[in-house]
Amino acid sequence: MSELEATIRQAKEALAENNAKKALKILKPFKSSLKKENANNVILNEVFADAYLDNGQVEKAYPILARACELDPEGQVGGPDKFFTMGQIMGGQDGVSIITRGIMNISNTGGEMLTNVQVEKIVGGLLSVIEIWMTDLCMEPNAEEQCEELIQKAMELTEGKSPETWSTLGSIKISQQKFGEAYEAFSQAWNFFELKKQEIGSGINENGDTTQKAGLQSEYVDLLQPLLSLTKMCLEVGAYEVALKVIAAVRDIDEDNIEGYYLEGFTYYLMSKLEIFKLNNPEVSLRPENIYEFNQLIQEVPLDLSHEPISQLIYDSRLALSFALQAGVNADSKDEIVQELLGGANALLQEIGGPLDPSELTQIKKGDLVNENEDLEELDIEEEYSD
């Protein structure tokens, strides 16, 4: 194995461990060669682009990624992933075109006997194209038709078993204001995410091969963002119990995930507001449609913190938001997303009684104190309007 091959392998291993800075450090000796003797090396261009992207340096990744796509137009050397990444960065009609090129490359290679990996990549490409149609191209007259056609293809390819496809379907239904159908789609998404998480977890525990195990661990961590996105979409249609199950899965993967804690606290906050609304408006039949409307008017619902029916919900909200603040103590002050989450957690806590004492959080973390809610039956809030 040459020095270059060893470097590429080590850099890929670092990226699999979600350590982009380490990967860039490993690659540094070959940086200047990208403009000289290794200018036409597809794999080196790809791994440099991946490292820059994972490190949040899109502007540095873009020209290198474009070069890789130019050098390997059929994806025969480095595979199709670069086309999907490039298309997502570009967006618009150009983005759709280059992602479609990647999809066609896989289809031409696999023919009628596509492997599971090839199907997964094609579906990922289809969902990326849908995202572009729902954002950059949403004002085009055929946008809705394109989304419907593409999601149907994705469903057919995965036999209706892809959690990501169900999540995207739910997002489409929200855009169409079909909130009941969105609710059902998100419930299905969670069912299949749960199965996927269990399968990957079992593979990690049972696999003795170090390389394969590292790959599975990377897949496990990769579930975080789609799960967090699903949580946020569940909240839009009042699928609160589903959201809490998804958040529990997030915690299994990353115990100190700040966004997960924030979303958990926000979910309980919404549930407490909804409980007050129900008590004050018993004649209203709650459904995903008016839960969506309710979310738009959430600030107008006053909270009485002494009101017994919501006391446990308020406590659970304070608990999760307090953990979010605790997890953010050592966060990068320049990370705008994290700082926004911490600001949101602080704002909610001011409304519901402030953070819990750090000593109480420590005891709960150790298991010395049990959250009272664990001994209560699950609230049936959403069942009343999910039919």
Curated annotation (Swiss-Prot):
<dbReference type="GO" id="GO:0005741">
    <property type="term" value="C:mitochondrial outer membrane"/>
</dbReference>
<comment type="function">
    <text>Acts as a chaperone for the L4 ribosomal subunit encoded by RPL4A and PRPL4B, required for hierarchical ribosome assembly. Shields ribosomal protein L4 until timely release and insertion into the pre-ribosome is possible, once ribosomal protein L18 is present.</text>
</comment>
<dbReference type="GO" id="GO:0030150">
    <property type="term" value="P:protein import into mitochondrial matrix"/>
</dbReference>
<dbReference type="GO" id="GO:0042273">
    <property type="term" value="P:ribosomal large subunit biogenesis"/>
</dbReference>
<dbReference type="GO" id="GO:0051083">
    <property type="term" value="P:'de novo' cotranslational protein folding"/>
</dbReference>
<keyword id="KW-0802">TPR repeat</keyword>
<dbReference type="GO" id="GO:0030943">
    <property type="term" value="F:mitochondrion targeting sequence binding"/>
</dbReference>
<dbReference type="GO" id="GO:0140318">
    <property type="term" value="F:protein transporter activity"/>
</dbReference>
<keyword id="KW-0143">Chaperone</keyword>
<keyword id="KW-0007">Acetylation</keyword>
<dbReference type="GO" id="GO:0005634">
    <property type="term" value="C:nucleus"/>
</dbReference>
<feature type="repeat" description="TPR 2">
    <location>
        <begin position="163"/>
        <end position="196"/>
    </location>
</feature>
<dbReference type="GO" id="GO:0051082">
    <property type="term" value="F:unfolded protein binding"/>
</dbReference>
<dbReference type="InterPro" id="IPR011990">
    <property type="entry name" value="TPR-like_helical_dom_sf"/>
</dbReference>
<feature type="repeat" description="TPR 1">
    <location>
        <begin position="42"/>
        <end position="75"/>
    </location>
</feature>
<comment type="subunit">
    <text>Interacts with RPL4A and RPL4B.</text>
</comment>
<keyword id="KW-0539">Nucleus</keyword>
<comment type="similarity">
    <text>Belongs to the ACL4 family.</text>
</comment>
<protein>
    <recommendedName>
        <fullName>Assembly chaperone of RPL4</fullName>
    </recommendedName>
</protein>
<feature type="region of interest" description="Disordered">
    <location>
        <begin position="363"/>
        <end position="387"/>
    </location>
</feature>
<keyword id="KW-0963">Cytoplasm</keyword>
<keyword id="KW-0677">Repeat</keyword>
<dbReference type="GO" id="GO:0045039">
    <property type="term" value="P:protein insertion into mitochondrial inner membrane"/>
</dbReference>
<dbReference type="GO" id="GO:0005737">
    <property type="term" value="C:cytoplasm"/>
</dbReference>
<feature type="compositionally biased region" description="Acidic residues">
    <location>
        <begin position="371"/>
        <end position="387"/>
    </location>
</feature>
<feature type="modified residue" description="N-acetylserine">
    <location>
        <position position="2"/>
    </location>
</feature>
<feature type="repeat" description="TPR 3">
    <location>
        <begin position="224"/>
        <end position="257"/>
    </location>
</feature>
<keyword id="KW-0690">Ribosome biogenesis</keyword>
